[in-house]
């Protein structure tokens, strides 16, 4: 087979690119991917004779059939869902305990489910924290379909679980019994073995040492590592915990040296590496980067090097892990490997390593922008420094301590990890915010990647490079500063947030959502959570290239917005914060704002916020119950907008009886006592957008149809985020 592969009539890297376009054309139903595949086929016809083209088309047909079969299986599984589940087998290494919340992945009826359960007692929590074996759980629960993305460029939980082979989630209401089980399934036994290793480390080593040991050896990070996780992410070096080539190489070399010392021949060792690779991949949770790296190592021992090695790895991944390239981890892992393969031969000495680090950072930048919308320039230097520390010092040290722990746990090195975390905190304080590039669309992404590839090709003849560099800069600028106006109402689960930006780059943010109310709990029930602002608002703004918010307006004095506001201030530069007089009178809130050195001033009736070549005017700043709240009105492009804040419509109508609006942006709390029709008869808008709180329902009279009033109603709980876009007139689009 290796001879057939080596004699393939076209460059194998060309074949892998051809199949990659075909892969995305089928799995993503992307017109751009189909266009790219056809373009490469046309190039193939021009550069190779018919006989060779026929062989390539045959290979494309075989892989295309495999892709279509996998796609069909996924669609079939997503449509033929089960109605109930009575027994689930726990996969131990997927257990996550966060306060009184338990989640894990379980098998039932040949399907995989993501399972949630609210723990009832501290003893039950400890039982699951120490659980390491396979158990069959008899239960009562409710099945549901995972949630789709709620905001533009937001995390699509349903699609993510789909790439993991999961199509339903299960929420347990009651556990009847748990029975220990045995299995011949290799994956299940490796899951149990990995869990045993994690629990052993947690039991015998203190934090933070235990977190680094589970992270670097097993690819497992607990919720108690959340703070450091955020710091590593903000510095752009969280990938140090993503097990990849360096870790795989370390353990593979250690394994080979051990058996060679025992006298095993190279030929026999070559085949013994296969079961080792299976066990090691299972112990790391079948991580995408580990599997990719292991495949490259296995192919290398059969003589495949460089681009041939990378190409065959991609082809094998198409077969054994069909969803690999649908995940961010899979794409980034292969992108890094490809860049390393292309530049690896040119590295020589420290200068070469620095050059390689720069080239990798530049080459991966478009893909990082696509997934994360930002880039931390400090990561180039920090990766260079900390990679050496993690891979050359911590990894061997932790491996040795883990092995010795079965004889006697040595915990005296914990101070090193405490020092490391203090250094990370200090560096985080010194570092600047990441550069926000925005999320390029697929067309821009492809243009960026092609342009960078051309620059690499012209690296020895740089006459054409300036034009390509200028083109790349323009693409990044268009992504960061879209040449369009927008008004976006985000789905914030609690409260609301409206983002406005015009073609000149002027930005206004109305409200930031509210912190979800949390019941007071005992210490064992407290859990680490991330705010809605971090999950929804901040990622969206960064995806649109926003680094500065010129004006942030809090339309009411609700203190629940304060926590979100402080998080926004850490992520973006804030020009000024406009609040009600009542907010200024709240000493506790103002003290927190002053500590953050934020510019805060009151907003008054009659004040205008200029944007879109026009303005929004504050027409009211007090509700019927004398509570401070702001309503704004103005003509933006071709339509008049009314933003009601928390002011009741009837109260507003008494003050402005002749007011009419084409578009009303309101919050559910405003109209919670009214039906849809009663609310919209007041202003008779053409379009009404309602921000609906997650745990509330908006009333609607039976038999009444809002369309009869000529009013289109968009609710965030049904449509997700709603966005108005345009140059001279508004076009509306929704997430769902």
Residue locations for each model-derived region?
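Non-globular, low-confidence helical/coil segments that flank catalytic cores
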Residues: 128, 133, 137-142, 182, ...
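Alpha-helix C-terminal capping segments
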Residues: 24-27, 42-46, 105-108, 198-205, ...
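Hydrophobic alpha-helical transmembrane segments in multi-pass membrane proteins
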Residues: 29-50, 54-60, 170, 228-382, ...
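Membrane-interface helix/helix-cap signal primarily in integral membrane proteins
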Residues: 2-5, 63-239, 535-539, 548, ...
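N-terminal leader/targeting segments
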Residues: 1-77, 292, 445, 733-735
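Alpha-helical transmembrane segments of multi-pass integral membrane proteins
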Residues: 341-440
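Conformational gate/switch positions in structured elements
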Residues: 9-11, 245, 286, 330, ...
